[in-house]
Amino acid sequence: MKIQMRTAMLASIIAATVSVAASARAQDGDGFLFNPPTGSWSVRGGYAMPSANSDLFKFTTDNLTINRADFGAFDVGGDVALTLKPRLDLVFDISYSGMSKPSEFRNFVDNNQQPIQQTTSFQRTPLTVNLRYYLTERGRQIGHYAWVPNRVAPYVGAGVGAMYYDFEQKGDFIDDSTRAVFPDTFRSRGWAPVGQVLGGAEWMLGTNWALKTEARYVMGSAAPSSDFQGFHRIDLSGFATSAGFFLRF
């Protein structure tokens, strides 16, 4: 429920921001068709699949009824871009994805022959600064008074930033030495540096609105908290695909 609420809140904030930008643009008499665009706002939604390659994830999938695919989640995000050159943008980006999955131990039950149950959740919120390079011209200047956008504008990009992550397991667990069942919460959260590469295309739907499709891969890891003592760094990397809308200004 908390993950769904946070996703909805982030989507609402991004949508409201773009709505304000669109309203302000409608009141501006200097339409971009008379000049090349100076930037853009965008919102998107899609699916994020963490790599889940570190030993903490392997321990989880080996012992609990969770598969690597269960760490995938709906992804929502947005960005604001500033044009540096005709084919180069500086982009500030934020996104969020999170999952929560109930599970039980695969090979053990409690003294009453009941499953030993717990819930695993994993949330990621990267904030990055990127350079986005367009593989073709985004449009062309006609005379001194008009700039006409091209129908499709493919691009690639790369960036760096920081990711806030939260990995939690809450419920009943087994003591390795005594086989006793006990309730507990194990949690690791914090900030970690990340890098990413991306590629996509913008498909113009009007003079300043467009459909945007994108794929990205984020790379990063974090040292686990003392709750997960003995494990190596937590893998924060993953692949995401998305589609959304953007507004040029």
Task: Give names to the regions the model predicted.
Residues 1-37:
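Cleavable N-terminal export/targeting peptides
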Residues 29, 61-67, 112-121, 143, ...:
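Extracellular loop and loop/strand-boundary signature of outer-membrane beta-barrel proteins
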Residues 36-40, 47, 83-87, 149-153, ...:
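Strand-connecting loop/turn motifs
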Residues 99-103, 115, 197, 203-249:
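Predominantly the C-terminal beta-signal and adjacent terminal strand-loop region
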Residues 43-49, 92-96, 156-162, 201, ...:
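Transmembrane beta-barrel strands of outer-membrane/channel proteins
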Residues 27-30, 81-174, 239-249:
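Gram-negative (and chloroplast) outer-membrane scaffold detector with strong preference
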Residues 24-82, 165-167, 242-249:
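Short glycine/proline- and aromatic-enriched beta-strand/turn motifs that initiate or cap beta-hairpins
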Residues 37-39, 70-76, 121-127, 152, ...:
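Residues that define the transmembrane beta-barrel architecture of outer-membrane proteins
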